[in-house]
Amino acid sequence: MTNYHVTLEAAWLVRDVETADDAIGVAISEAGKRLNPKKLDFVEVDVGTTYCPACSEPFGSVFIAANTALVGLVLEMKVFDAESDEHASRIAKSVIGKALTDVPLNVVDVEEFD
């Protein structure tokens, strides 16, 4: 059995915000509020990065229209004693998905560690 570090991305909708910084703060706070009661404080939450297709400059994954933001969050957790990287990603999606119901999740990266 092997240990894995699994990175997921989530699409988080935030209403009634005017700036990207406000949207990021609200999204991270709301995600934390939903993870902590489930004892998932070991899940790291951060804003994702998107790259400009024209100039390749990185920027925060936030899009705002009509005071509503779509924030791309990155969720990271360690999975211990998984049979494979596919198994580790299923475990991570299951654990995080139970706390963040109705939030789209996608596996971004799975890395083995000792």
From Swiss-Prot:
Pfam families: DUF555 (PF04475). It comes from the Archaea. Signal peptide: none annotated. Belongs to the UPF0212 family. This is UPF0212 protein Mbur_0968.
